[in-house]
């Protein structure tokens, strides 16, 4: 253990003596602080704006005069999605996904179907976030400070002396890895903790137990990633004859993992699981609706059958003899049919996007960057699963609201004044506003089961390599 501590101590001294490393730390520190400041301020400002708009929408909604319930259902309601508390750190798809949905009767406003909106690919390169710096630039820093850690010792003959002194290969690699890892963690994980602390001190209302748990997992996730990068750096340095060769291999590996494989995963996903455009999506729904029937057509087969069944159930011959307003009853059935059809198409579409993104999830077993990126977005609530959950919750709210007004129309509006009778505005003013039910960390991770298994795989792989694998590596 003492020999490992000595190796770690020497590694720290070597890194600190490297002026370029110190300059890079300064540059990265400035970038991290700038990204953190922009992220925190933008997240806070966006949420203030969206909350203000949401209050204005609510005020306009409750200030409506007495109306026909069907008119109210078509008046609509605009819902804004607040940015997650940790989106200041990891933008995810926030910059590409929509932030508001208009809810109205008989119409499901579709999600943004652009590739940008649902992509987990390379579109994030144009954004400067803390997560992007830690995911792509910090590995380069680790490669730079560690590429010669064993290769240079091998080329100048010092390694033979160390091995002759009886230092085991496993301890040597352990010490070098821990030295690079501990230095990187002290600097960059420390920066994460500092920024998170300052952000939550500045905006204490955002710090809930759920957000704290997500923050802790994010810190653990990035810490493990730094260890993987340190471990890979030492292994490649150990297998290289010179430091320059090791650096070349490491840069090629960075390009492969950070640029080529993510883009390849995206393109392969699109090729294997093509998704319809927004126009195609809506056209398919319209075509299926035409096959089901049109509630506005008195001669439509489906709704004629529905009318006959309703009359038979109440033992009457005409809708005028029903104990309720048939128009409201018919609208409720039409809403049910169209909603079921839309949800079936929507679920199929989301399955397509999930299949596209599964390519990157499976590649996480060979690419730790993809593992980190996917879990980082999941943990911070900025991935596709959270956005789709928001869409589904708003759709459920829209359906409940619409059916409530259909029931009012059915039971409280006179059939002879179906289109003109107004109800007291108190009947819709007391409806609860939409409130998004935040999901916990375990829900977020459960939607990334494959990537989570890849995370466990990398940890087990490293543990096994330190236990059994390093004895076979030839350093001399």
Which positions does each model-derived feature cover?
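Helix-loop-helix units of permease transmembrane domains in multi-pass membrane transporters
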Residues: 6-7, 16-17, 144-185, 470-475
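Long, hydrophobic alpha-helical segments
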Residues: 86-91, 126-152, 156
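C-terminal membrane-exit region of the final transmembrane helix in multipass inner-membrane proteins
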Residues: 230, 234, 242, 469-471
């Amino acid at each position: 253990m003492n020999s490992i501590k000595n190796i770690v101590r020497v590694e720290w001294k070597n890194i600190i003596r490297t002026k370029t490393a110190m300059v890079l730390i300064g540059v990265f520190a400035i970038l991290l602080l700038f990204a953190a400041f922009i992220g925190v301020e933008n997240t806070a400002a966006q949420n203030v704006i969206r909350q203000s708009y949401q209050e204005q929408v609510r005020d306009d909604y409750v200030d409506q005069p007495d109306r026909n319930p069907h008119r109210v259902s078509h008046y609509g309601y605009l819902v804004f999605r607040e940015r997650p508390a940790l989106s200041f750190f990891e933008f995810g798809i926030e910059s590409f996904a929509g932030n508001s949905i208009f809810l109205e009767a008989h119409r499901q406003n579709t999600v943004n179907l652009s590739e940008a909106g649902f992509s987990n690919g390379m579109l994030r390169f144009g954004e400067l976030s803390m997560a992007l710096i830690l995911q792509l630039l910090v590995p380069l820093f680790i490669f730079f400070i560690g590429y010669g850690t064993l290769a240079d010792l091998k080329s100048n003959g010092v390694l033979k002396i160390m091995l002759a002194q009886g230092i085991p290969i496993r301890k040597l690699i352990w010490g070098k890895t821990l030295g690079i890892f501990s230095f990187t963690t002290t600097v960059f994980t420390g920066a994460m903790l500092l920024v998170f602390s300052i952000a939550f001190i500045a905006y204490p209302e955002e710090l809930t137990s759920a957000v704290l748990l997500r923050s802790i997992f994010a810190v653990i996730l990035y810490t493990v990633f730094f260890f993987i990068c340190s471990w890979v750096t030492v292994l490649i340095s150990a297998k290289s004859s010179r430091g320059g060769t090791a650096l070349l291999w490491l840069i090629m590996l960075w390009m492969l993992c950070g640029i080529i494989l993510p883009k390849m995963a995206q393109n392969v996903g699109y090729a294997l699981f093509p998704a319809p455009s927004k126009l195609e999506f809506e056209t398919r729904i319209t075509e299926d609706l035409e096959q089901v029937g049109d509630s506005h057509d008195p001669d439509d087969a489906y709704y004629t059958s529905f009318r006959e069944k309703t009359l038979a159930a109440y033992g009457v011959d005409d809708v005028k003899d029903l104990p309720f307003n048939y128009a409201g009853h018919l609208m409720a059935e039409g809403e049910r049919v169209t909603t079921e059809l839309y949800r079936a198409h929507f679920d199929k579409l989301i399955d397509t996007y999930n299949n596209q993104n599964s390519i990157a999830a499976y590649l996480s077993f060979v690419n730790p960057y993809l593992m980190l990126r996917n879990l980082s977005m999941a943990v911070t609530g900025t991935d596709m699963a959270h956005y789709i959950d928001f869409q589904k919750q708003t759709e459920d709210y829209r359906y409940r609201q619409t059916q409530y007004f259909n029931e009012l129309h059915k039971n409280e509006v006179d059939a002879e004044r179906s289109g003109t009778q107004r109800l007291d505005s108190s009947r819709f003013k007391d409806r609860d506003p939409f409130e998004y039910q935040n999901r916990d960390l375990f829900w977020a991770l459960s939607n990334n089961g494959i990537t989570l298994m890849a995370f466990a795989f990398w940890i087990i792989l490293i543990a096994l390599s330190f236990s059994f694998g390093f004895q076979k590596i030839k350093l001399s």
